[in-house]
Amino acid sequence: WLLAGARLTVRDKQPLAQMLQGCTHASLVPTQLWRLLNDDAALSLKAVLLGGAAIPVELTERARGQGVRTYCGYGLTEFASTVCAKEADGAADVGAPLPGREMKIVAGEVWLRAASMAAGYWRDGQLLPLTNDEGWFATRDRGEIINGRLTLLGRLDNLFFSGGEGIQPEEVERIIVAHPQIQQAFVVPLDDAEYGQRPVAVVECD
């Protein structure tokens, strides 16, 4: 966008609708776009890139009715965000890799490679490698590639997303069972129209 002559707007700690005043393009999670449309606020947005959760067709159609084109994307923080993108069309796939990104499926898992990606994970004073010896990053996402387009099928672990935030059930369970009156806890995702999924804890108490 910047190379194309656009201006980047950075605003801090304001309501979403206020932050986006005057903006024509934005990257949002579906929950944020739902809230914008439900507020009936005047929108200057022309196009929105959506990601971080399942994207309902109802949402993209409603946005289109208000003059906002929507694009669905798949990305990771390790890759400076977007890896695949396409204009939302109701199909299940998230599009083809953007220029400079490579993608393949290994034993049902999505593997990625690109020049613009993180050098590694910084832990305990050390930079841990992100990729294997051939430069491929194993995402832990399940997927399939049909006609060059990626369709995501879920996770290989228990991670799920709520409002664009990744939630690892085991981490939440560990905090819950730290309470002296909780014997055990099990956290599961529950489908939610606004957040995509919400975490729900089933607990056994003393």
Please report, for each region that a protein language model flagged, where it lies by residue.
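Anion (oxyanion) recognition and catalysis
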Residues: 2, 64, 97
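Glycine-rich beta-strand-to-loop/alpha-helix junction loops that act as flexible
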Residues: 50-53, 74, 113-115, 163-165
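Residue-level signal for inorganic ion chemistry
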Residues: 1, 26-29, 48, 52, ...
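Gly/Ser/Thr-rich phosphate-binding loop
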Residues: 25-28, 36-92, 102-104
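AMP-binding/adenylate-forming catalytic core of the ANL superfamily
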Residues: 114, 135, 140-206
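AMP-binding/adenylate-forming
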Residues: 1-39, 47, 71
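Conserved ATP/PPi-binding loop(s) of AMP-dependent carboxylate-activating enzymes
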Residues: 96-99, 106-135, 155, 165-167
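Generic beta-strand structural signal
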Residues: 44, 105-106, 138, 145
